[in-house]
Amino acid sequence: MVTALQRTPVAAVVGRQLLRSGTAVGANYREALRSRSKSEYAAKMNIGLMELEESSYWLELLDEGRISTGAEVKALHAEANELSAIFVSMIRKAGLGANSAGKF
């Protein structure tokens, strides 16, 4: 999706940021799965949640700034929202309490 963006300086910056935050979600999730403690798990999952929120922000900028307004942007934004809900649920189910999820 990032490679399909317009060839403008603004699209390049937003695309680079989206690529960085989007790939960080998966990296932090994998690190959380290999964590050594609940607190380390919570920390990595919360970082992943923050990266999802950042990805949502960049997707909103793509849409609202008319850099890319296709159905793919809307679908990715919906997926980021779904993943955020899943991350919050996983943190809560790990016994870290509702207050741990979403608190940075």
Q: Where are the model-predicted features located?
A:
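Short, C-terminally biased terminal segments at protein or domain edges
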Residues: M1-F104
